[in-house]
Amino acid sequence: MRISVSVVASNVVVDNDLISLDVGGEMTLADLKAVIQSDINIAPAAQSLFHNNQLLTDDSKTLSQIGVVPGDMLGMHIRVPGRELAGSQGSANPSARTTQESLARRQQALPDPETLRLHMLGDPRVYETVRMQNPQLAAAARDSRLFREVLSAQQRAEADAEAAKEAKIAMLNADPFNLDAQREIEDIIRQNAVSENLHNAMEFSPEVFGRVTMLYIPAEVNSHKVKAFVDSGAQVTIMSPECAAACNIMHLVDRRYSGVAKGVGTASILGRVHLAHIKIDDLFLPCSFTVMEGKHIDLLLGLDMLKRYQACIDLKDNVLRIRDRNVPFLHEADLPKHQDEFANEPLIHGRGGALIGGRTGAVTHPAGNPGSLAQNAQTLPARANLAAPVGTPSSSTAPGRNPHSPSRWPAESISKITDIGFTREQAIQALDAANGDLEGAIGYLI
């Protein structure tokens, strides 16, 4: 089985603070420490291992007896005798010393700022990606002196944040048997695992950060051309009131079927058109439409229509197969105009500096700071075609808001969101991003 060992505190420098090991359930704790020694050259006597906030003291127990299962992460404190004095001598200003060391490491890893600036200006793809991730740095690219100042300021801010994190870990490890401290250490270990998972996704599966276009086909209803959204997750076929009026079938709406649709939010159902013909390719197919407000989509082909005519969504050939006809899905350039709104959708400031799309929920800038954007610029040509860039400058801050400040949105909408467990501030931010659309606001928050 594979487990991980995270070095959460150490009075010596180790080559790797996160170790992945293949071990057996019958391996003893002493054997595990020997394996760790072979990886990072730390003697077993200096290793203190923790599992589920419990210090492991019996080296004769096997991993199975301890309760270690595949995928577990153990915490490890390293205390090498004779090193505490050296550490205390330099502890007069540990935060400043750590900041300087971190800044020096970053500067060594980065190329010369002028080389980096010229690289950005020489490759439009790199410049555009940096502009989306770090507008301040991109805006300074035309001025060599200003670029150097902005880059240095961002590096110092990142180094300060890293130093503060290391200082917090050191403070927590000052009392390793404090339960509250151990809970915080466990949370730090979890966050490190999340960051590692993000980096692995960026390296091995960058396509997961891309933007997927929805499936539309050309159709006609009552001789009116419409772009129909194919949605096998919808129970019924839905049409907007505007589209029904344009198709001249609004007078056929049976309002006895009106009501409220509940799901992620609510929408008003005006009624039902029991029978109308929809033209797909050269086929004229009888269809019923539920006329519903609150949707950006003119026509949505639901499961009732798809199952009735045994339609097949073929993603390999990018076609909808229906009655022996192959109807190609529309290309991105041919999608309805309202889809363009998502390209310039408003952004909401999340925790840790994350920027999140107010409508799609796509994370434009992940929380935290996995690395300097300037440092990542060297690898941007390989990722320049990604729709959703990754990384964010540490200077991103969420604007403050008084939780009881007046809002331009109806109190009823805010109340509906707060009733399901969110704060008033979150409700107002979500409504701002969704331009007052209650369903979109709830969808983002969920």
Curated annotation (Swiss-Prot):
Principal localisation: cytoplasm
Task of the protein: Probable aspartic protease. May be involved in the regulation of exocytosis. Acts as a linker between the 19S proteasome and polyubiquitinated proteins via UBA domain interactions with ubiquitin for their subsequent degradation. Required for S-phase checkpoint control.
InterPro entries: DDI1_N, Peptidase_aspartic_DDI1-type, Peptidase_aspartic_dom_sf, UBA, UBA-like_sf, Ubiquitin-like_dom, Ubiquitin-like_domsf
Ubiquitin-like domain sequence ranges: 1-83
Region (Disordered): 387-412
Assembly, per entry: Binds ubiquitin and polyubiquitinated proteins.
The protein's Enzyme Commission number: 3.4.23.-
Classification via Pfam families: Asp_protease, Ddi2_HDD, UBA, ubiquitin
One function term, GO molecular function aspect: aspartic-type endopeptidase activity
Active site: 231
BP GO annotations: protein transport; proteolysis
PANTHER family in the cross-refs: DNA DAMAGE INDUCIBLE 1 HOMOLOG 2 (PTHR15397:SF3), SODIUM-GLUCOSE COTRANSPORTER REGULATORY PROTEIN -RELATED (PTHR15397)
Gene3D superfamilies the UniProt entry points to: Acid Proteases, DNA helicase RuvA subunit, C-terminal domain, Phosphatidylinositol 3-kinase Catalytic Subunit, Chain A, domain 1
Subcellular location field: Cytoplasm
Keyword terms, alphabetized: Aspartyl protease, Cytoplasm, Hydrolase, Protease, Protein transport, Transport
Domain UBA: 408-446
Protein name: DNA damage-inducible protein 1
Family, per entry: Belongs to the DDI1 family.
GO CC term (a single one): cytoplasm
